[in-house]
């Protein structure tokens, strides 16, 4: 058992402490000053839904523009769970090599996929006047996502199509990147477990698949390698691990008093322990349906509803009656939302909740 590696006394924390810690760690308690985009993106920004990365930045940084995802300090890659991610260019190795499998057979499969991507890229370069699909060029989408673990692929998703190109891979060794990826995971959605880290960082099965045996084995090895940096904590009858440097912040985290519209795939929502974030099964299935995910309404530390955007209209569905000042704060969030629309309006979906 992994916990045998940790002889320190187990710290007990409340759900409120844990949620407040995560919100503060991911800058949801107070917006950063303009321009501090890289700092806000330390755990990567999933960009699977139209411009989710920009809206995640908006929830954390002042004066974010609609084109923030194109900032020269960022690149797009296939990252954790095989999803499209916007990550700091300086941290590409963390989000690519950090997911490179230790198993030699799986590692060989990643390298083989990268070779296929190289051949496909050459095929395209050899026929510049022809539009070749990935399959026609000799590689499929799943192979490209696997090849991205080498760090040699860059992508650009424009909400309609995904283009990709080859670049020189990072020169770093994978092991430091693996450990750093786990640190960022624990800093953003910790305390957690190797099993949850395997799900969060995986990529073989795609965004919605369960972890493979190889991914779980790698996650266990990563936590063992970080033994001296981790501390075991207990919360809600469960045990998990956090960075030792975060222990006091976990125990003392004060409730957050802000209103934010979090996009689908937001770093705060990217944890496997969804029942901790949303205890009610009915609301959990509404926030994470089998179809397209909505965004989440965060009010003073709790997720209290969902929202969807179509052009300039934002439809908010609350799970409980909202105070007038909260509704006013939501409307202000919408008014400053960095979306390219000449008109922004909010629609309240009452359904069976008396607003």
Per-segment meaning from a language model:
Residues 259, 266-267, 274-315, 320-323, ...:
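Low-complexity, glycine/alanine/valine/leucine- and proline-rich hydrophobic stretches
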Residues 96-107, 170-184, 188, 251-260:
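Short, amphipathic alpha-helical interaction segments positioned at domain boundaries
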Residues 142-223:
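Loop-centered beta-sheet repeat module
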Residues 2-135, 284:
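Phosphate-backbone binding and catalysis cores of DNA-processing enzymes
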Residues 328-355:
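Cysteine/selenocysteine-centered motifs that mediate thiol-based redox chemistry or coordinate metal-sulfur cofactors
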Residues 110-118, 175-182, 327:
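Short, leucine-enriched amphipathic alpha-helices that occur as contiguous helical runs
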Residues 228-282, 286:
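Non-catalytic regulatory appendages
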Residues 73-83, 149-158, 227-234, 305:
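A short, conserved structural fragment
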């Amino acid at each position: 058992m992994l916990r045998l590696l940790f002889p320190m006394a187990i710290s007990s924390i409340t759900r409120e402490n844990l949620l407040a810690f995560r919100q503060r760690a991911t800058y949801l308690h107070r917006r950063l000053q303009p321009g501090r985009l890289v700092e806000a993106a330390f755990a990567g920004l999933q960009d699977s839904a139209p411009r989710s990365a920009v809206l995640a930045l908006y929830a954390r940084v002042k004066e974010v523009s609609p084109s923030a995802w194109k900032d020269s300090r960022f690149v797009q890659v296939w990252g954790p769970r095989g999803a499209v991610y916007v990550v700091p260019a300086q941290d590409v190795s963390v989000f690519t090599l950090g997911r490179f499998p230790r198993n030699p057979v799986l590692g060989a499969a990643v390298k083989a996929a990268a070779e296929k991507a190289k051949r496909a890229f050459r095929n395209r370069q050899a026929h510049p006047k022809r539009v070749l699909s990935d399959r026609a060029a000799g590689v499929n989408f799943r192979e490209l996502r696997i090849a991205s673990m080498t760090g040699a692929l860059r992508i650009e998703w424009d909400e309609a199509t995904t283009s990709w190109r080859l670049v020189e891979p990072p020169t770093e060794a994978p092991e430091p990147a693996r450990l750093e990826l786990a640190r960022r995971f624990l800093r953003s959605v910790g305390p957690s477990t190797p099993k949850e880290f395997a799900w969060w960082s995986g990529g073989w099965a795609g965004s919605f698949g369960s972890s493979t045996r190889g991914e779980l084995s790698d996650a266990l090895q990563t936590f063992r390698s970080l033994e001296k940096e981790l501390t075991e904590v207990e919360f809600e009858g469960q045990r998990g691990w956090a960075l030792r440097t975060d222990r006091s912040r976990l125990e003392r985290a004060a409730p957050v008093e802000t209103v934010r519209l979090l996009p689908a795939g937001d770093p705060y929502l990217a944890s496997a322990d969804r029942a901790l974030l949303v205890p009610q099964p009915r609301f959990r299935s509404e926030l994470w349906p089998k179809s397209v995910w909505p965004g989440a309404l965060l009010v003073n530390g709790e997720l209290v509803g969902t929202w969807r955007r179509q052009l300039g209209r934002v439809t908010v569905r609350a799970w409980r009656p909202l105070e007038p000042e909260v509704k006013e704060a939501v409307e202000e969030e919408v008014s400053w939302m960095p979306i390219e629309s000449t008109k922004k309006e909010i629609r309240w979906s009452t359904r069976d909740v008396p607003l």
